[in-house]
Amino acid sequence: MFNMNINSPVRFVKETNRAKSPTRQSPYAAGYDLYSAYDYTIPPGERQLIKTDISMSMPKFCYGRIAPRSGLSLKGIDIGGGVIDEDYRGNIGVILINNGKYTFNVNTGDRIAQLIYQRIYYPELKEVQSLDSTDRGDQGFGSTGLR
């Protein structure tokens, strides 16, 4: 079912000369760093759509997951949204959320997030009247304990 060539390159376009190619910082890095194409200021408690000026073609049966960078997370910067569908071809934008106490500045060329390619399965959904029971049932949000 997943007949994809893992050696096929992913095609991308730099939409402007401000765009920087996605990069991996080590041979085994899970994600490709995405870079801001512009300067932004994000006050505490606010969010901002950061444009990369990169568009790309996702591999077949894959989607792109926008994930936080650990160094930014340490500063209180998180990611909102974060899914690039297989058929999306527009400018990749990253929603940065400033959960910190201080204004956060993004400069042109800053690494803002990482793009991780993940396989996806498109199941057929079927509505039913009830589901099989399990020991856990409908117990959620902390029901399995802390330890």
From Swiss-Prot:
Binding residue positions for dUTP: 68-70, 82-85, 88, 93, 95, 111
Molecular functions per Gene Ontology: dUTP diphosphatase activity; magnesium ion binding
UniProt entry tagged with the keyword Signal: no
Enzyme class, first EC level, given as a word: hydrolase
Cofactor dependence: Mg(2+)
SUPFAM superfamilies named in the record: dUTPase-like
BP GO terms, sorted: dUMP biosynthetic process; dUTP catabolic process
Entry EC number(s): 3.6.1.23
Binding site for Mg(2+): 24
Keywords from the UniProt entry: Early protein, Hydrolase, Magnesium, Metal-binding, Nucleotide metabolism
UniProt-listed CDD domains: trimeric_dUTPase (cd07557)
Recorded catalytic activity of this chain's protein: dUTP + H2O = dUMP + diphosphate + H(+)
Upregulating conditions: Expressed in the early phase of the viral replicative cycle.
NCBIfam families found in the cross-reference section: dut, PRK00601.1
Family membership: Belongs to the dUTPase family.
Protein task: This enzyme is involved in nucleotide metabolism: it produces dUMP, the immediate precursor of thymidine nucleotides and it decreases the intracellular concentration of dUTP so that uracil cannot be incorporated into DNA.
Protein name: Deoxyuridine 5'-triphosphate nucleotidohydrolase
Taxonomic source organism: Variola virus (isolate Human/India/Ind3/1967)
Protein encoded by which gene: OPG046
